[in-house]
Amino acid sequence: MMRSSLGKSVRLRPVCTLLGLAVFASATAADAAVHRVHPGESIQAAIDTASPGDTIFVEPGTYQETGNAQFGLRISTDNLRVIGQVNEGQGEAGKVRLLQFGTQQTGVYAAPQGCGPELFVCADELQGFYIRGFTVEDFPKNGIQTRFVEDFQIIENESARNLENGLYPTLSTNGLVQNNISYGALDTALWVAGSESVRVIGNELFGSPTGLEITVANDVLATHNDIHDNTVGVGLYHPNAAGNPQRPVMANWVIEQNRIHNNNLPNPAPPGSFQAGLLPGFGVLLLGVSDHVVGKNDIEGNDSAGIAVVGWCTATSLGDPSRNCSNDPPQADPSANNNLIYLNKLSDNGLNPTPGIPGVDILYLQTPPFEAGVGNCFEKNKPASFTFLSSEPDGQLPTDGC
């Protein structure tokens, strides 16, 4: 652990993340072959003939793979690098586009052989996966998904209108998701679920119910992302909303130095889904989770609240009073505890709130005794005149964790 500039203890990602990526790079460099795919040829055929450590270069063009009824591309070979050779400045003609065909559900799925997306346990683990330069379009489930992968890199891809999740690292470890664009999902543009030691850097995420979502994960850093025009910009959600099993430790989600703005999209999620219950206008929504950091972000123009820290049962009962902690017990502690909210720059938030929501820069709501709300620290957010509403007895934002 280390201390932040404010003295708050902050756990850092394990150094094995960087070491793992270095080992991955060295492994792929030794005795590796290069495969090239041109328009009219099959990317999947090259994947199927590749050996661990090989690199596949794909020329610009539009590709529809017909060999797999479930996935556009299925990767189960260790340390494979799949690279789209984008020609900048040529628009659609310069992209490597992967389009949905037939009954395919997910665009790119990387996981060990025999371990499908319906499984929560796999006897094996895929070692190393790298994808760059793909535009994945119009799949009914996910754009690019990893599952049971150790050491993965998802870099400079575009996920367009993949209807559940755009980029979806699940049950995976030691990963980098960097400089991607993801939009048009009906769930989440980028969802880190059940994963550990993941860096999310420099992505643009927009046009979805949630821009960046983190659930049941451990050690996630999100920095220098541009998150805008979603229903909720950043969603840090309780295990009840996860759809994946809980990890032994689910802490240290660090949301720092991002631009989070204008997240006021009318919610496009299908009725009955968890996402359909999200109200528009929230920059960061921390919902019944603990031991996380939201700091040094520029948060502006979110109609309901710039940052909301809310207990799980409080949030669910706002929409349905019968869904309180007594009648609808949560899977885990519903409190938001031990969170650090510091040095965020807040402007023009809460100016056009959803009916029933008090429009403010910072909203803090928890309902004792089920939601104790201990150890939280709101410190040095600016300007000093930012607006807030707090359920604390003294009406102030909590500082007992500072």
Which residues fall in each region the model found?
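N-terminal secretory signal peptides that target proteins for export/translocation
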Residues: M1-L12
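Right-handed parallel beta-helix/beta-spiral solenoid domain characteristic of secreted/periplasmic
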Residues: R36-P39, P60-Q70, T77-P140
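Short glycine/acidic-rich loop motifs that flank beta-strands on beta-rich extracellular proteins
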Residues: I47, G67-F71, G91-A93, F101-T106, ...
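Acidic, glycine- and Ser/Thr-rich low-complexity intrinsically disordered tracts
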Residues: A315-G319, S326, Q331-P334, K345-C402
